[in-house]
Amino acid sequence: MVGEMTNNGRIRPSFPVKDLTSNEGSEYGGPVEFTREDVETLLHERIKYKSKYNYKERCENTMDYVKRLRLCIRWFQELELDYAFEQEKLKNAMEMNEKHCADLEVNLKVKEEELNMVIDELRKNFASVQVQLAKEQTEKLAANESLGKEREARIAVESLQAAITEELAKTQGELQTANQRIQAVNDMYKLLQEYNSSLQLYNSKLQGDLDEAHENIKRGEKERTGIVESIGNLKGQFKALQDQLAASKVSQDDVMKQKDELVNEIVSLKVEIQQVKDDRDRHITEIETLQAEATKQNDFKDTINELESKCSVQNKEIEELQDQLVASERKLQVADLSTFEKMNEFEEQKESIMELKGRLEEAELKLIEGEKLRKKLHNTIQELKGNIRVFCRVRPLLSGENSSEEAKTISYPTSLEALGRGIDLLQNGQSHCFTFDKVFVPSASQEDVFVEISQLVQSALDGYKVCIFAYGQTGSGKTYTMMGRPGNPDEKGLIPRCLEQIFQTRQSLRSQGWKYELQVSMLEIYNETIRDLLSTNKEAVRADNGVSPQKYAIKHDASGNTHVVELTVVDVRSSKQVSFLLDHAARNRSVGKTAMNEQSSRSHFVFTLKISGFNESTEQQVQGVLNLIDLAGSERLSKSGSTGDRLKETQAINKSLSSLGDVIFALAKKEDHVPFRNSKLTYLLQPCLGGDSKTLMFVNITPEPSSTGESLCSLRFAARVNACEIGTAHRHVNARPLDYRLSLG
């Protein structure tokens, strides 16, 4: 019990005290309980002596009084520790409840966003059904079913929101209860501090009387300490002997079981031998009787012969059983000897286990050091390769295109220095030779392409800024390279493959103490306007006039980081969640049909992944950024035949790509002024092209002979990019708290 009320209304503490048998409490028979009256009585107690000159009695009474005081003080100290522990426990419970509430709020927000997406999709389906209803009356039933699904989804959303709200209210009630308990504990803690102060004050008055008794107490303490240490050592030895005895008993039990089995087998064999001997004696008696009567009864000769044969067979069986008995006795002797051998083997195995544990610890340390060295060497290799690298990819011929013409237009050198890196383009009888970091032929698979960039993606986990973008004319395979073909796992693009590698690597690095948080944003630049592709507000993504009503401003800070104001940022925990977001963004992206491409991307697509990692053992924090960009395709107005909105889109695309060319040209010439602000695209890519990022460009070209001019322009632009020196990328390591605004650089 915590306490009880006295007549004057004050609380009289009454707490059970643990057995203090290691010290003075052993004289009072175990558990002791104090009340406030007991404490006051003890403090005001006056020691009475039978004789004023009996110093032995005075010393014993004083020591007894001091022991009771020390027991009371010890009780208050343990009580204070219990309250401190309870207070810390309640504080931890409150923090866990607050964290649980925060997690519930985040989950509620994510669920609301997902369900809003579902509702928007259902509304879109319902709108299309309504249009069909006006045209064809026969589809009325399908429209009603779609409306029913939307209502069910809305009811499910409302029920889910109600359940989450109820759980949140319950958690808040638990938090309020915990706060009340903490307040009560604080009040009791103050009361105990007052008691402790009064006891310490009175104890200081008695300190003078205790000086004579201190010497005896110190000697007793030293003796007790020595005894306790001896007991501890003996307990350790006893524990080790118990473990050895238990192991020996296990081995002995196994041997005894084998011995009992062999003894039982020997007894059984002896019984069988005795039975056979009895049968033999009985048959011998019968034979003797028959032989005595043989002269009279010749008819029994056959029976006698049969019995003799049986007797010989039984004699053989007796010999075999005797041999088995001897073998069993030998096995028993071997089992007795194997008991000692097993005990010795157990000790050897125990030593081997300890040695293996030591080797395992050394191997783990070497693994950690090796991982550090791998990261260092990997980043050194990337630096030596250059900050802006260029890969060229030639798409395969489509159906209807002449493969023989492709062989005349594009060729690949076979010399050792240019193998896998060179490409030759033939135009009007003149050959143009280019060399890049890597050239992918049309037969190269998506996996082949990803293997070449996988180490660059690893740099983002190590704390670097990484940018990969695809450039080329419309229809050259940029979107296929970056996104792949939905529904076909073998043709997944670089973006989903990069995310799968990052999630797998994050899982493998957990054993080394690393924890990562990942955040995703997706946007498009359409007609020099930024659109948020993850926004749940449909009007914020696209307006009828092609201009987004939401203004998204690009901001650069002093540290070289870039973020887009008000852009939707989503915390991701799995590659499936990212696939869902990519599908959502693909539905919102601007795509149109032109004379050169059935599904032409009419905007620049920017996928950004911010990576924040923390190592619990080294307390090191890294922050990396991975930008994956699918640029809109360049096209000539004379070939695309664009008019109206398509004409405006083409002009905006060509203008932004021209601004990108101006930036690359200025960087290649190392001019003082680089025109990053000439377009939204170049301003957004400023961190990737400004020297603090590891940047890779894919130049995609088509083998179609009619596109040789555009392919030559793309290859020349790529060669200029490959010649740029933009500086050395830096690893971003710090101990600052996570910034939840997604940075593009």
Swiss-Prot record:
Location(s), subcellular:
Cytoplasm, Cytoskeleton
The coding gene here is KIN14M
> Per the annotation, which location comes first and is thus the protein's main one?
cytoplasm
Chain positions covered by the region annotation Disordered = 1-31
Please give the name of this protein: Kinesin-like protein KIN-14M
Q: Name one GO molecular function term.
A: ATP binding
What is the organism field in this record? Arabidopsis thaliana (Mouse-ear cress)
Start and end residues of each Kinesin motor domain: 387-724
Question: Which keywords accompany this UniProt record?
Answer: ATP-binding, Coiled coil, Cytoplasm, Cytoskeleton, Microtubule, Motor protein, Nucleotide-binding
